[in-house]
């Protein structure tokens, strides 16, 4: 597939920069913000459904191929929660409230039952009605700490223990995180599918 530019279905400048770095220079990512500030309602019941919904919407708005990601944290003890509701886990009150709610939900839960994984699904559509979106999933396994640790990252990063580095994901520098994360793992697969390896 020969793509020179994609619209990223996100208004988040940090995510645009992170994904552009992972994608490399042969494909230019543009923000959907160039075309509309309206975000679609995420009505899907899975990461896959929401990623496809966002990609189709961005392609419809821009007339260009579009890439979307839907990501979140799935905690084993909580049956996969907060899952697709990760960003709104504490009713839209932000990262600190989400982290506090998660710590409260896992209060007194021992380390061996605090397994979790960050999940990322990337969906690429060639056009808004693409019958066969390209889907790539990345998982990053770890566990939830009892207290926040680290200054980098965002979201649940300060609570997510990375066993292969013996630290939280918020203690990893951006370049190291961009090699290990769920989003990085999904992007490796997408680059392969696009023939960019």
Swiss-Prot record:
Its EC number is 3.6.1.66. Substrate binds at residues 10-15, 71, 154-157, 177, 182-183. It is an enzyme of class 3 (hydrolase). It catalyses: XTP + H2O = XMP + diphosphate + H(+); dITP + H2O = dIMP + diphosphate + H(+); ITP + H2O = IMP + diphosphate + H(+). InterPro entries: dITP/XTP_pyrophosphatase, ITPase-like_fam, RdgB/HAM1. The active site is at residue 70. CDD domains: HAM1. Belongs to the HAM1 NTPase family. This is dITP/XTP pyrophosphatase. The lineage of its organism: Bacteria, Pseudomonadati, Pseudomonadota, Gammaproteobacteria, Pseudomonadales.
